[in-house]
Design a protein with these regions (language model features):
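N-terminal beta-strand motif that seeds the catalytic metal site of vicinal oxygen chelate
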Residues: 1-20, 24, 79-84, 130-146
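Core segments of cupin and vicinal oxygen chelate
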Residues: 2, 9-58
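Vicinal oxygen chelate
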Residues: 5-13, 42-45, 56, 64-146, ...
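Flexible, glycine-rich phosphate/dinucleotide-binding loops
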Residues: 47, 70, 133-136
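Conserved beta-strand in the GNAT
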Residues: 61-64, 127-128
Length: 146
């Protein structure tokens, strides 16, 4: 293995609230791991670490009980950001706010990359979303058109 990122963790003051948020927003499946406050996260078919065990195009993760206060709104990011590849950044940004998230950075086009946006989940964890399709319908990564 060549130092690949193979797992992520989300810290939660109220785990069930974030299980519901990410399940409804991104369709992720959460399974509690024994009697401890930890849930495995399956992000979808083809993810590294799925039941089939074969490498794919993404990674699975976990959700754990936070051991301390949740981040205050406007606080600098501590740690790493999770960025999720999606089909439509704008619709998921809107859905995320309906589910209790807050816009951390509005959706915008990044020339040559695609469309990105960042939300705070209901526990103030920041995460991003990215799509190759920009607002004008062109493809950022790869330079083609949709």
């Amino acid at each position: 293995m060549a130092n690949l990122v193979v797992h992520f963790e989300i810290h939660a003051s109220e785990p069930q609230r974030l299980v519901d948020f990410y399940s409804q927003l991104l369709g992720w499946k959460f399974t509690q791991f024994g009697d401890i406050p930890y849930w495995t996260i399956e992000t979808g078919e083809g993810a590294i670490g799925n039941v089939a065990g074969s490498a794919g195009h993404g990674i699975n993760g976990g959700l754990t009980q936070r051991r301390g206060p949740k981040p205050e709104p406007g606080a600098p990011v501590m740690g790493c950001n999770l960025v999720v590849g999606v089909d439509d950044v704008d619709s998921l940004m809107a859905r995320g706010t309906e589910l209790g998230g807050t816009v951390a950075r509005p959706a915008e086009d990044m020339q040559g990359v695609g469309r990105t946006g960042y939300l705070l989940d209901p526990d103030n964890n920041v995460f991003g979303m990215i799509s190759a399709v920009m607002s004008d319908g062109t493809i950022g990564m790869g330079g083609g058109e949709s």
